[in-house]
Amino acid sequence: IRHILAVIGIDPLDFMKRVDGTFKQAIKYVNWLEGNGEYFYHAFDKFQVQPIDRAALRWHMSDRSVPFGETTSIQPVICELGRTPIPQRGSQFGEPLKFAFHMNALKFADMLCEIATARGVKHYLDHVTEVDMHDNGNIAAVLTKSGKRLEADLFVDCTGFAALLAEKKLEVDWVDCSQWLLCDRAITMNVPYEHHYPGYVRPYTTASALSNGWVWEIPLQTRKALGYVHSSAYISEDDARREIRAFEGPHAESLDTGTVHFKVGHRAKAWAHNCVCVGLSGNFIEPLESTGLYLSDLAIVMLADHFPFDDDSTAVAYRFNRVMA
């Protein structure tokens, strides 16, 4: 995300103000081993190592009194202290550590729309009702509910799991991976700080194991976002809702919840004919490591680097699909 902000030319401080953003420098995994409150960190930065990294070997040969994560990175300690990954202004103690951001995705979408339209992009808020095709199998135009006919040489399918272009019209197969990744639902909840939370914004994401999945806790500036990721084959929606309320505490009984349905897998071809899948229309891996953001970022960068400048996109589509599909 920091790379994308730099490419677009967005000031990180302005970004954080606009999208309710906070720092994210690690993921803290709680109750994944014994369920007794134990935890470990996946930090984003690590100590400089020699050409051969022997950190794991040294830790196994030690008395293991220090958690493994703390022997490879300073960030677990910084996270426990609730500190930012950026040194105080004017500090002489080095460069910032690696970090990302927590953000309100809807506010970020509004911000990107504002920037894009200011740079000449035309934005239509509409619904696609039909797709016209060329004889060669390429998409000719999309027709909208308001009566518009939008023609283009290249179409980007950002319609989520619906994949209105790639799946509904081009009939590109979806490669299902649910036999390996079982989770397919998330019960979501927002907890306002002012009423139900002490206002302590942690500089990391928390992933806590529950009976049939895990809960994300994402701290924003004004609220905490929770989501119980689980498999509908092993727990009902009502039971999952009760479990996330119990996890959060008595105040959660009065809070609204939502349900997100998702499928794990990828499109057999992320680039088919003159249609490129970006985001959920092309792939999704369960949200444990925020891979959805990474894959969307990668697809955008790949498309920019392999943008076709003539009618024959065979070579660039082949390379795009080797990476993305």
Write out the residue ranges for each language-model feature:
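C-terminal helical "tail/cap" subdomain of flavin- and related membrane-associated enzymes
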Residues: 305-325
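Alpha-helix-centered segments that form part of catalytic cores
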Residues: 65-103
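Residue-level marker for buried hydrophobic side chains located in beta-strands
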Residues: 275-277
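Predominantly flavin-linked oxidoreductase catalytic cores and closely associated redox partners
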Residues: 91-245, 300
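Conserved FAD/dinucleotide-binding core of flavoprotein oxidoreductases
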Residues: 209-261, 281-295, 306-309, 313
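Dinucleotide-binding Rossmann-like beta1-alpha1 core, especially the glycine-rich loop
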Residues: 2-81
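Single, function-defining residue in the core of a domain
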Residues: 244, 267-272
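Extended charged low-complexity segments that act as oligomerization/scaffolding linkers
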Residues: 8, 12, 28, 196-198, ...
